């Protein structure tokens, strides 16, 4: 699909028989992470406040998150263990950076069961009630990342609704809805 091509990652494949030939099939790749994340995030966004976002991690899911945020005209910055031309390191996160990026999305597996006593190394003390912390992890329902955000008054959301919405999107693709 055009969105999966732009993102550069596929997590759902549609297999269709080529018309008129029973031996050939066409495969089309889709990215339902994009759909699930975007649909679950929209109700939480206040565009007067949420103009910039930090995306923790640089794996496949981070690309879908970045594309969804960009489509909502939210400026993004990737944060990774290693610096690169398109990302900063956790060590570079200052009070000013946290302050100006009101959305922080964890796309890493940090905090996932059974390693629940782990979380991204960010300066949580600079979070406020204007911040929105979104963790793609959904087990446990409240990760240490979300718990620390909640402690400072941030709006928090786990990845459970995203998971459900991406499953529905995949179902629609496979059943041509």
Predicted regions mapped to residue ranges:
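Phosphate/diphosphate ligand-binding glycine-rich loop within oxidoreductases
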Residues: 1-44
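Glycine-rich adenosine-cofactor-binding loop
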Residues: 31-34, 41, 50-70
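Short, well-ordered alpha-helices that flank and scaffold nucleotide-derived cofactor binding pockets
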Residues: 39, 43, 67-71, 147, ...
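NAD(P)-binding Rossmann-fold cofactor-contacting core
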Residues: 72-88
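Rossmann-like adenosine-cofactor binding region
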Residues: 86-157
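Short helix-loop-beta connector
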Residues: 46-52, 128-129
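Active-site capping/gating segments
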Residues: 39, 154-177
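Hydrophobic anchor at the start of a short beta-strand
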Residues: 53, 76, 156
